[in-house]
Curated annotation (Swiss-Prot):
Single GO molecular function: single-stranded DNA binding
Keywords, alphabetical: DNA-directed RNA polymerase, Nucleus, Transcription, Zinc
Region Disordered, annotated ranges: 136-164, 247-294, 373-420
Protein name according to UniProt: DNA-directed RNA polymerase III subunit rpc3
Compositional bias ranges of the Polar residues kind: 374-388
Species of the source: Aspergillus fumigatus (strain ATCC MYA-4609 / CBS 101355 / FGSC A1100 / Af293)
Length: 629
């Protein structure tokens, strides 16, 4: 992340969101890396009356790390590149929250993002989160898409709108259950390297470590450091908020209950949690300070990217829309129970990454999530006599005890139609588990059918698809064929590559030369003797996905920074006009206060701004594929 173009992009994002003062301090820290207060003051050329309040605000926004040394007592400051980059995803995160939890939840999260971190008691006093503001925004209507029992449990149906905490606290717990907010810990204000050094120092000072020596000491220190580091930085608030693998307050798009079930349920979701927490001091301390958590966001983006990949294959490789919807339900279940895409900070190199499977999801749980109105049978082949519902042509039995037990033993739901539908869902997932998709994996856990995905395989597939899409757009389908051959076979000389790809030598050489100039393929020279004569040298072409991903990532950072710079330039050209349109009396009344040419100029500016910001968002999706998954 700490490259020239990444630092430039983060500086632009900070200045775009927080102003020139924050941008100047952040640029100084990113340029000189780690500074104490006197040096920061000298390099930034700012007085104390501006520097100190700005530093405090940037620490509040998690844009700057601070660490006080145990040796000399000097406090050092360091730029937080990761939090600065995630400013570009704030709108996408709020869109996710509004889609899943409603408009009021998005407002609460937006307030926490604006404050950096905040106490719950302070959030209760904010006017934009009061019941009057909620009524004005129409939140009860927004949450009308929930099931009735979820509306009752979340308290978002307007029944308790006279007391604002009754609406705020369930919303905070819903955000915590989804992983959007976390508990503030002191170690989160320090860099990862400083936290490791502090944890290692604390582990080595323990009395039991003095009796160990050599390799055993180093292993014990590493194990203890990782455990202490996880304990200090863990801000998870999902304890007690995940029920049967689904967060409380999750928004459902359909009702899966049967007609004979009661239409209402007891209000036990958040009411029981609040009653149990009233006298629990530890739980109250947990919820005293909250902040925005970005760790789960790549998981959501990854799930959406995988669903988009399956949807694109509907016409290419015969994947039906129903199969894509079933896969979306599986990814949603996995996303609820997974906090991070991977355990390590860096993406392991290809060939060195081990298997990392997600949590297994029971087939019966997926049957509850899939929309009952979704047609699953029309896109699969007919069932034969060996399938669970094998009594085709016969009248179904009403009291089939043996058949019911047989279905339940295999993880299928009881009942005729339920068993058929569960089997159809299993068939759709089995289709995705077969080549060339390889997107799912079937397992038996305690005699029940479960489905899982392999994270590293899917992340690698997404990266390869993105690179192949880019190569095909730049160099054509012939280059794509050559790259696929090199990726499958490894290093090849020109003659062997021509035999496998079935291309003329002239076309092959042109494609290889153009891709080598673009950095997508490279040439390795293997001399046969010590003289290194060209006639006695073997030239091998190869394709390195890791190197290309890193190069594409840097180019993406550069393109994003250029888009933001262009946006700033276009804004400066019509600065006076934009200041006029942003006045409180003009905003919302443009037709009344602006002339016809000014309205045309405003429309052109909004279209240009949407184009540039949309391009930045699209490039951010590429960054997520190349860096975060």
């Amino acid at each position: 992340m700490t490259s020239q173009f990444a630092a430039e992009l983060c500086e632009l994002l900070v200045e775009e969101n927080f102003g020139e003062l924050f941008g100047r301090i952040f640029a100084t820290l990113s340029r000189y890396d780690r500074l104490n207060l006197p040096r920061l003051k000298a390099y930034s050329e700012l007085p104390n009356r501006q520097l100190l309040p700005a530093l405090a605000a940037m620490i509040q926004q998690h844009l700057v790390y601070h660490y006080t040394s145990y040796d000399d007592g000097v406090t050092y400051y360091e730029a937080n590149m990761q939090s600065a980059y995630y400013l570009v995803r704030s709108g996408k995160i709020l869109e996710f929250v509004e889609e899943r939890l409603g408009k009021y939840a998005a407002t609460v999260l937006s307030t926490i993002m604006y404050l950096g971190h905040a106490q719950v008691s302070y959030l209760e006093t904010l006017p934009e989160l009061t019941s009057e503001a909620v009524k004005a925004n129409g939140v009860p209507e927004e949450h009308g898409e929930h099931e009735e029992d979820e509306e009752q449990s979340n308290g978002l149906n307007g029944e308790h709108s006279n007391e604002q905490p009754e609406l705020l606290h369930p919303t905070l717990k819903a955000l915590a259950a989804h992983g959007y907010i976390i508990r503030v810990r002191e170690a989160q204000f320090q860099s990862h390297a400083d936290n490791i050094l502090d944890a290692e120092r604390a582990i080595r000072s323990k009395p039991e470590m003095k009796a160990l020596k050599g390799k055993r000491l180093e292993e014990a220190v590493i194990e203890g450091t990782l455990g202490l580091l996880k304990e200090r930085t863990d801000g998870d608030l999902t304890r007690g908020l995940i029920v049967h693998g689904v967060p409380r307050g999750a928004k459902r798009k359909h009702s899966s209950r049967r007609a004979d079930e009661p239409n209402k349920k007891c209000r036990t979701d958040f009411a029981s949690v609040d009653e149990n927490d009233e006298h629990d001091e530890e739980e109250e301390n947990e919820w005293s300070d909250d902040e925005m958590g970005y760790d789960t966001t790549p998981m959501e983006v990854s799930a959406r990217e995988l669903y988009a990949t399956v949807s694109e294959r509907e016409t290419e490789q015969g994947v039906s829309p129903a199969t894509a919807k079933v896969y979306e339900c599986l990814l949603r279940r996995i996303e609820y129970q997974t906090h991070q895409c991977r355990d390590t900070a860096e993406i392991p190199r290809e060939g060195e990454e081990g298997e990392q499977y997600s949590v297994p999801i029971a087939l019966s749980a997926l049957a509850e999530d899939v929309n009952p109105q979704l047609d699953l049978s029309s896109s699969t082949g007919p069932m034969d006599s060996s399938q669970p519902d094998g009594r085709r042509g016969k009248r179904p039995w009403d009291g089939d005890v043996e058949g019911t037990n047989h279905e339940e033993a295999n993880g299928l739901s009881s009942g005729g139609s339920g068993g058929n539908r569960t089997f159809e869902i299993d068939q759709h997932l089995s289709l995705l588990a077969q080549p060339p998709h390889n997107l799912t994996s079937k397992r038996m856990v305690s005699g029940l059918i479960t489905w899982t995905v392999e994270f590293r395989h899917l992340a690698r597939k997404l990266r390869h698809l993105e690179l192949e899409r880019m190569i095909e757009a730049r160099y054509g389908d012939v280059a794509l064929r050559v790259v696929r051959v090199l990726h499958a076979k490894g290093k090849l000389d020109e003659k062997r590559l021509q035999e496998i790809s079935l291309l003329p030598f002239k076309d092959l050489r042109q494609v290889l030369a153009s891709m080598q100039a673009g950095g997508f393929v490279d040439l390795q020279e293997v001399p046969r003797d010590a003289q290194r004569q060209p006639s006695r040298t073997i030239y091998l072409w190869y394709y390195d996905p890791d190197r290309i991903c890193n190069s594409v990532l840097q180019d993406t950072y550069k393109a994003m920074s250029r888009c933001l710079q262009r946006l700033r330039f276009e804004r400066s050209r019509i600065k006076d006009f934009l200041e006029k349109t942003e006045r409180s009396d003009v905003k919302g009344n443009e037709q009344r206060f602006l002339s016809e040419p000014e309205l045309v100029l405003l429309e052109q500016w909004r279209a240009k701004e949407a184009l540039l910001l949309g391009e930045v968002a699209r490039l951010d999706e590429m960054v997520a594929v190349m860096r975060d998954y």
